Amino acid sequence: MAEKENVHPQVISSFPTPSKALKLSEKSSLKDVQTDNAAVPLVVDETSYPEPTCEFYGGLLGPQLPEAERFVLDPALVEEYRHKKPPFGFNGLGEVVYLRTYAREKDNGQSEVWLDTVQRVVTGTFEVLQHHVVNKLHCHWDAQKAKERSEDMFRRIFEMKFLPPGRGLWAMGSPICRKKGFAAALNNCAFVSTATLEKDRVGPFLFLMDASMLGVGVGFDNAGAGSFTVPGPDDTQPTYKFMIPDKREGWVESLKRLLKAHFCHTADVEFDYSKIREMGTKLKTFGGTSSGPGPLINLHKSIRKILVGEKGKPISVTCITDIMNLIGVCTVAGNIRRSAEIAFGEADCKEFLDLKSYETNPHRVEYGWASNNSIFAKVGMDYSDACERVRTNGEPGFAWLSNMQAFSRMNGKPDYRDQRVLGGNPCLEQSLESMELCCLVETFPDKHETLEDFKRTLYSALLYAKTVTLLPLHWRESNEIMLRNRRIGCSVSGIAQFITNRGLHELKTWLEEGYDILHQYDCQISEWLCIRQSIKLTSVKPSGTISLVAGATPGVHYPESCYYTRRLRMARDSPLLERLIKAGYHVEPCCVAPDVTAIVEFPVAAGNSIRTTRDITMWEQLSLAAFMQRYWADNQVSATITFDPETEGLHLNQALQYFQYQLKGISFLPRYPMGAFKQMPYEAITKEQYEEAIRKVKEDVSLSSANAIAETVEENQQTFCDNDRCIKL
């Protein structure tokens, strides 16, 4: 990847690569810098990162249209909704999650309110559509149809009948996309295979870091293990020093130089971190503050230590996963760049299965948590060894690659549409080729009175997701795949609520008719935009913060309790805290980091009649996942099955024997008593406790008038992986 011709100013391959010690880019210069040992040549990279040639979407969509012709959302529509109350969910929890996670800072320094965010997202979507039709296709733009479609999308997002992914709420129509051209920021997740390591020894690692620093969750495999012997740096050449530019590309370039030294037997490299801005410096485009050079320094030290020990050995499963996990730790530590990882390994590889055994691999305690680990299960295999491990800590998960390649929906009719698929994203709701990204969008069937209204929502949801596929990325290999596949993940959430209110059979009807109409819409939209129809359209994402905003149960998951306390972690200096206290919510210092983090408690009522995870067996949860895989998801269903280790753990092997023919992927989580640990994200309470807590909440206190965006504080305890690390830039 890194050696190919540049296709975009931001692409990795625009970096100069030293052949011998000191082959520099044309305008770079050499200086002697004294180190502890001797004078080391310094590579000063001053010209490798040109800015986009056009401020409008980084020049990706062509020149900006004349002002009189540009798409503008009807001001009358915006005014109509200005004083309408957004339907945030769960007694203020949804609004706080929105303000904390997705509301951007406006030019006047104030935080967006929901109306502002919806206006920005819809405007950004139709800007992309207009420029695709006018600039790329040179076709007629029907302003009246655009007005009708944009207004429908606006209403359905405002009313939370569907929502773009958290990344879309944060980035669509923002400077991240409009000025910088970082289209990857609108895509949720990706996958990269290491099978190419013999030919390209650094590319998969660079892709994962570059994508992670844009907030894209990345899955990876260990197919490249054993493909080459780690030679170590070339000691016959002098070590040189590289001054790291204060940009995302600079961080990735530093990793490239370090890995090339050890994997390709080139000159060793030392790093100068002096250009990286100090910790706490405000990040204007991406939001948040700089982490400083600390996480990158730790990454370099940790990887160097591992690779020195691997010299002369074939690259191993452990080495590949260690490097990927350390990159994940670095990007999570990088303040606002949150991301997630999943590692895939072979079912019979004991080395892979032992990666989360910290008795066997004590050195991995500090970073092994950075990925969920899943095995590529084979239909008909013996699951007993893996299931014993699942009983202990919930891993590994299971991915049936043969089912992913052979089936769309698991309805007994293989179509082999996706034979190039090699893995999936961190939550495993998307089948993906290597270096393929995906865009997800979330609908809420239970927020619709009629099936016909739900079908109309599906049009707007698909139009948003399809629009994201129009924006090329800065990876050539990814563009080649994504232009061919146009893969979409149109998801449904609040399934437990729908079943409770209308029944499973009604859900089956909505899913089947919704799936059929989506394919009709895809044909219409693809024809209008002169692009290919999507290879697959539907998924069930695990959801998380997005479902909290809308007040929906996440994906296919049932709530932990009818009444519970939901705790959020927030920065102690967040401007939201004062208003939350004034509004009557309980706030206390975090027991782990009391000086920097506060805990806010929200009383939540999931509903008297809804069943909870305590009422539903492991077998019923698996059956619901299989039901959704049969009637809705042609990609995959992301489901975490909770189970009682004592009463149900012994049945895991038998359960997988039955459901291996009905699923593409599944993960498990041992069930522990809620409240077993202090300040857990969820804690069951009684109806009386809920009513007492809710009486203290003052509805007349506005939370959205805080004048700045609250810092996001990561929640490692989140059950489902669609949390801050996965979806927030």
Curated annotation (Swiss-Prot):
Gene name for this UniProt entry: rnr
UniProt-listed Enzyme Commission number(s): 1.17.4.2
Pfam families: RNR-II_ins_dom, RNR_Alpha
Reactions performed catalytically: a 2'-deoxyribonucleoside 5'-triphosphate + [thioredoxin]-disulfide + H2O = a ribonucleoside 5'-triphosphate + [thioredoxin]-dithiol
Molecular function terms, GO-annotated: cobalamin binding; ribonucleoside-diphosphate reductase activity, thioredoxin disulfide as acceptor; ribonucleoside-triphosphate reductase (thioredoxin) activity
SUPFAM superfamilies documented for this protein: PFL-like glycyl radical enzymes (SSF51998)
Assembly information from the UniProt record: Monomer.
Disulfide bonds: C189-C438
Species whose genome carries this gene: Euglena gracilis
Record keywords: Allosteric enzyme, Cobalamin, Cobalt, Disulfide bond, DNA replication, Oxidoreductase, Redox-active center
A single GO BP: DNA replication
Presence of the UniProt keyword Disulfide bond in the record: yes
Keyword Transmembrane helix among UniProt keywords: no
PANTHER family the record matches: RIBONUCLEOSIDE-DIPHOSPHATE REDUCTASE (PTHR43371:SF1), VITAMIN B12-DEPENDENT RIBONUCLEOTIDE REDUCTASE (PTHR43371)
First-level EC class: oxidoreductase
Native organism taxonomy: Eukaryota, Discoba, Euglenozoa, Euglenida, Spirocuta
Protein name: Adenosylcobalamin-dependent ribonucleoside-triphosphate reductase
Classification via InterPro entries: RdRp_reductase_class-2, RNR-II_ins_dom, RNR_alpha_hel
Active-site residue list: C427, E429
Family listed: Belongs to the class II ribonucleoside-triphosphate reductase family.
